[in-house]
Amino acid sequence: MLQQNNLQNNKGLSQATYSLENIASIVDGELIGDPNQLVSSLGSLQKASKDCISFVSSKKFESFISDCSAGAIIVKKDFKPADNKNYILVKDPYFAFAILSEMFDPIEDMFEGIDLSNNINPKAEVAESSKIYQGAVIADTAKIHQNVLIGPNVFVGPDCIVGEGTVIHANSTLMRSVTLGKNCIVQNNCILGSDGFGFAPSEDGYKKIHQLGRLIIGDDVEFGAGCTIDRGALEDTVIGNGVKLDNQVHIAHNVILGDNSAIAAKCAIAGSTRIGKNLQMGGLSGIIGHLEICDNVFIGAHTLITKSISKPGNYVGIMPAQEHTDWARSSVAIRKLSKK
């Protein structure tokens, strides 16, 4: 059983609600639809509910609009609505989304309520059989299950859950909204659930997109030292059961990594890529964003995957270093040879 302690002076998570009239004014947009419709969160086109607001920043995503259940959709000014949904027309939907992400970010002060004499927020749920070592900080709304070991100077942030039998070594961080399964091992200096790399460009620079999703990690997962795994922007980042990561692996926001995958040191997977089971990646290899990778793919060391993979197999793309012009010619020649 989890031990529930009392909490003092906790504000909790904000649950702000706005009318579409408010939203349109905030993002300097034109509202088409019901000005009194209320929304309380952001959501993707595929998963948004009636109390969510979503956005479309590219024509390639407009095909999702017809099935979208969002309370309103932010679109470009030249968009021509063909139904009775609520729309907000703006110059730049992505930048408008960035503005709203800050409004709907629920975390005000993740360190509030922590007593510096023991570093555990009095509302945190900590099982009696777990061990928490000196300097570790446990935020409010965090839950630590049975037989967990949390090393020195670990931070477990708001809405984080640590499963039974999991070990988190010194100086690691579960930033926020991280669910860590049973019997996991987190080696030193890992950062789980950090902000993804999301910024909306404008003429004046970049506007930060607040990351509102979670990081969901399965059972029997091991993270080598110095791994960095971002939580989702709107939807969740998901790491499957039995995954093993070597040192200094980076996985970006919204990635889905299938069960029993193994990734060697200093690999990186860019945002919103979906990967099946049993992936193996050799050291210093990478996968760019928004791809689909099937089950049972092996990627050789130093290989960069730039297209989706639908056929299981061993994929290698290593070339000796050359001057750029020579490299470009060699690449074209190799592609022609492989098609013969």
What are these regions (language model features)?
Residues M1-S117, P122, S129, V178, ...:
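Terminal amphipathic alpha-helical/low-complexity segments used for targeting or macromolecular assembly
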Residues F55, I114-E323:
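Structural signal for interior beta-strand "rungs" in well-ordered beta-sheet cores
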